[in-house]
Swiss-Prot record:
The gene is F2. Belongs to the peptidase S1 family. It comes from Bos taurus. Expressed by the liver and secreted in plasma. Residues 554-576 are annotated as: High affinity receptor-binding region which is also known as the TP508 peptide. Activity is promoted in the presence of negatively charged surfaces, such as polyphosphate and dextran sulfate. Inhibited by SERPINA5. Thrombin, which cleaves bonds after Arg and Lys, converts fibrinogen to fibrin and activates factors V, VII, VIII, XIII, and, in complex with thrombomodulin, protein C. Functions in blood homeostasis, inflammation and wound healing. Activates coagulation factor XI (F11); activation is promoted by the contact with negatively charged surfaces. Triggers the production of pro-inflammatory cytokines, such as MCP-1/CCL2 and IL8/CXCL8, in endothelial cells. Residues 367-621 form the Peptidase S1 domain. This is Prothrombin. Glycans are attached at N120, N144, N419. Its main location: secreted.
Length: 625
């Protein structure tokens, strides 16, 4: 059949050509007539069939106006079309002349309200550093790359995705100011969108310089005459009957002179000097002294980032290390003597699936990703639960049958409208499943009191991000409910070395997400990940936020080839390490904050529990009965 049709084609074409020649004078207009009827600006093709070429954006949209569909035909990419169309529509008033359109599309200046702006200004008009668009700290942004895919919400550059009449803006890194406009150049004019108005005090995230004089050793040797606390309360005289009663049975250093009512640090509190005060819930408050910067890893003989002392190196062996209870059982409750020894593991001399990795890290082991936890792996894990709407709020940890430890920002953080009371919350203990009620295993308890550290700094950097929760009544311990130990100075000195690994557990999201439905990233059961401690200089260099002695960071460095991190929902949960000397688990940190989840060059930051242990003891001693 093909052989029959082939030879006929030339004949057909010849007949058609002849027909056109005979009748053309009746069908076609002369060139001059046609030009007079069709007055249309003509575009010269630069090549064969130029209009159907991929990526011909120049012809379709720049030489004359185009539709979104035409832009998509040229770009053949939805994301690229979104990005181009956002700028193109923002530049509608600058279509002519062509040079003005080019300047607008380049985006280094603001046209109109500045929705076209794509420059690199990342500081607000008052000098505050902009928050990363992908970050939820310090503010939870309702505008992000998912809600506004064409707005070029990269890094922390000023943008105007919502068409604000004041021009490009950003969320700020100051928890006290949610968003502020930026000062960017206006296209074709010698002015900026808004004038610069410097704030008194400058950026909230800058590293504050040390004063020339500072108080060393956390005020242990302080002999000054300050007698007023951070809240302005006047100190009680140490010789007063009330102060004597409160000092009874306290482990004070007899070498510290308790003169008059001056601030002192007789118990070696890592928070510094303090005094008793009248009519306060805890009967004591800290004093506002300028302490010298002395990282805890330094005064513990543990300089994160340096090799541990070879004489103290752990070669996979364990030795008996006598455990000394720290708290008064009358106020603390039961469980400390047996803390950190899991009923389904240490008490049965059974290892869990990944604890070997922790021991290997003490002699240079590997990092693994997060995975489902074994049942009973973290019997101190607590779920902080909101009553209405019913939802997982945060993680927490059981430290006795009466007390729970969590992060302060889980309870009080005004930028996220958090200010919870005991009536808003309950705790669920002994859980493994995230959503299912585990009958005969989990216990649900109401709260009696919430105690947030008095110097918790939500306004700047979440310093002292710690809170104590007192249960309504003691919880019954079991194979699935068991307290974790809090570290003493010796344990912290032995375990807090860069590269040594700890463990984070929680029901938080398995990856960062902006979608309204997060079911696909929520785990069904408790997750566990082992993470290495990171050198303090690396922690500080990874963020613009001011890092204090009350924090440490952990996670992976770029290029190490492994991933994992705490994420949203894990906050308040424990960072624990297992001592190879006595086989007990110690809570070294509390999941506090991070910039995104599992991002290269970014680390998770944790509240340093040992640094704040004296505060924990004082609250429990005063208020635990």
């Amino acid at each position: 059949m093909a052989r029959v049709r082939g030879p006929r084609l030339p004949g057909c074409l010849a007949l058609a050509a002849l027909f056109s020649l005979v009748h053309s004078q009746h069908v076609f207009l002369a060139h001059q007539q046609a030009s007079s009827l069709l007055q249309r600006a003509r575009r010269a093709n630069k090549g064969f069939l130029e209009e159907v070429r991929k990526g011909n954006l120049e012809r379709e949209c720049l030489e004359e106006p185009c539709s979104r569909e035409e832009a998509f035909e040229a770009l053949e990419s939805l994301s690229a079309t979104d990005a181009f169309w956002a700028k193109y529509t923002a530049c509608e008033s600058a279509r002519n002349p062509r040079e003005k359109l080019n300047e607008c599309l380049e985006g280094n200046c603001a046209e109109g309200v500045g929705m076209n702006y794509r420059g690199n200004v990342s500081v607000t008009r008052s000098g505050i550093e902009c928050q990363l668009w992908r970050s939820r700290y310090p503010h939870k942004p309702e505008i992000n790359s998912t809600t506004h895919p064409g707005a070029d919400l990269r890094e922390n550059f000023c943008r105007n995705p919502d068409g604000s009449i004041t021009g490009p803006w950003c969320y700020t890194t100051s928890p006290t100011l949610r968003r502020e406009e930026c000062s960017v150049p206006v296209c074709g004019q010698d002015r900026v969108t808004v004038e610069v108005i410097p704030r008194s005090g400058g950026s909230t995230t800058s590293q504050s310089p040390l004063l020339e004089t500072c108080v060393p050793d956390r005020g242990r040797e302080y002999r000054g005459r300050l007698a007023v606390t951070t809240s302005g309360s006047r100190c009680l005289a140490w010789s007063s009957e009330q102060a004597k009663a409160l000092s009874k049975d306290q482990d004070f250093n007899p070498a510290v002179p308790l003169a008059e009512n001056f601030c002192r640090n007789p118990d070696g509190d890592e928070e510094g000097a303090w005094c008793y005060v009248a009519d306060q819930p805890g009967d004591f408050e800290y004093c506002d002294l300028n302490y010298c910067e002395e990282p805890v890893d330094g005064d513990l003989g543990d300089r994160l980032g340096e090799d541990p002392d070879p004489d103290a190196a752990i070669e996979g062996r364990t030795s008996e290390d006598h455990f000394q209870p720290f708290f008064n059982e009358k106020t603390f409750g039961a469980g400390e003597a047996d803390c950190g020894l899991r009923p389904l593991f240490e008490k049965k001399q059974v290892q869990d699936q990944t604890e070997k990795e922790l021991f290997e890290s003490y002699i240079e082991g590997r990092i693994v990703e997060g995975q489902d936890a074994e049942v009973g792996l973290s019997p101190w894990q607590v779920m902080l639960f909101r009553k209405s709407p019913q939802e997982l709020l945060c993680g927490a940890s059981l430290i006795s049958d009466r007390w729970v430890l969590t992060a302060a920002h889980c309870l009080l953080y005004p930028p996220w409208d958090k200010n919870f009371t005991v009536d808003d919350l309950l705790v669920r203990i002994g859980k493994h499943s995230r959503t299912r009620y585990e009958r005969k295993v989990e216990k649900i308890s109401m709260l009696d009191k919430i105690y947030i550290h008095p110097r918790y700094n939500w306004k700047e950097n979440l310093d002292r991000d710690i809170a104590l929760l007192k249960l309504k009544r003691p919880i019954e311990l079991s194979d699935y409910i068991h307290p974790v130990c809090l570290p003493d100075k010796q344990t912290a000195a032995k375990l807090l070395h860069a590269g040594f690994k700890g463990r984070v557990t929680g029901w938080g999201n398995r990856r960062e997400t902006w979608t309204t439905s997060v079911a696909e990233v929520q785990p069904s059961v408790l997750q566990v990940v082992n993470l290495p401690l990171v050198e303090r200089p690396v922690c500080k260099a990874s963020t613009r936020i001011r890092i204090t002695d009350n924090m440490f960071c952990a996670g992976y460095k770029p290029g190490e080839g492994k991933r994992g991190d705490a994420c949203e929902g894990d906050s308040g949960g424990p960072f624990v390490m297992k001592s190879p000397y006595n086989n007990r688990w110690y809570q070294m940190g509390i999941v506090s904050w991070g910039e995104g989840c599992d991002r290269d060059g970014k680390y998770g930051f944790y509240t340093h529990v040992f640094r704040l242990k004296k505060w924990i003891q004082k609250v429990i001693d005063r208020l635990g009965s």
